[in-house]
């Protein structure tokens, strides 16, 4: 099933109704990239994003972060530290309105 996003469908299958690939969940709206900060909740991950905000008084930038809870389908194997892509969907709970649609492969060279 095509999501309309530039992500690969996972090879594993799942019986999750809230999976955008194998279930009935449709995605719309914004897509975000971030790092998985927590996998403690069942079928949920917390994705953390860092961004810069300009402080006009000092003419400098300050780091901020936002944490977005997202649904983790069973077909995606997620761990803390993974860089993932999440997409907006209908509200799944009081705080969850995003779903993980893919894991971004980290391109690391041996130039350390």
UniProtKB/Swiss-Prot annotation:
Q: Name one GO cellular component term.
A: cytosolic small ribosomal subunit
Gene3D superfamilies the UniProt entry points to: 2.40.50.1000
Cite a single Pfam family from the UniProt record.
Ribosomal_S17
PROSITE patterns found in the cross-reference section = RIBOSOMAL_S17
| PANTHER family (alphabetical) | 40S RIBOSOMAL PROTEIN S11 FAMILY MEMBER (PTHR10744), 40S RIBOSOMAL PROTEIN S11-RELATED (PTHR10744:SF9)
Organism per entry: Haloarcula marismortui (strain ATCC 43049 / DSM 3752 / JCM 8966 / VKM B-1809) (Halobacterium marismortui)
UniProt similarity note: Belongs to the universal ribosomal protein uS17 family.
NCBIfam families (alphabetical): PRK08572.1, uS17_arch
Binding partners and assembly: Part of the 30S ribosomal subunit.
Question: Which GO molecular function, any one, fits this protein according to its record?
Answer: structural constituent of ribosome
Q: What is one Gene Ontology biological process annotated in the Swiss-Prot or TrEMBL record? A: translation
Q: Which InterPro entries match?
A: NA-bd_OB-fold, Ribosomal_uS17, Ribosomal_uS17_arc/euk, Ribosomal_uS17_archaeal, Ribosomal_uS17_CS
Q: What is this protein called?
A: Small ribosomal subunit protein uS17
Q: Which UniProt keywords apply?
A: Ribonucleoprotein, Ribosomal protein, RNA-binding, rRNA-binding
């Amino acid at each position: 099933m095509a999501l309309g996003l530039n992500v690969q469908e996972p090879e594993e299958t799942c019986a999750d109704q809230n999976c955008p690939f194998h279930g009935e969940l449709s995605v719309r709206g914004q897509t975000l990239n971030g790092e998985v900060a927590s996998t403690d909740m069942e079928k949920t991950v917390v994705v953390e994003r860092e961004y810069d905000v300009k402080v006009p008084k000092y003419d400098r930038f300050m780091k901020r972060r936002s944490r977005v809870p997202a649904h983790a389908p069973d077909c995606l194997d997620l761990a803390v530290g993974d860089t993932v892509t999440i997409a907006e969907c209908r509200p799944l709970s009081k705080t969850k309105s995003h779903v993980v649609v893919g894991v971004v492969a980290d391109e690391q060279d041996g130039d350390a």
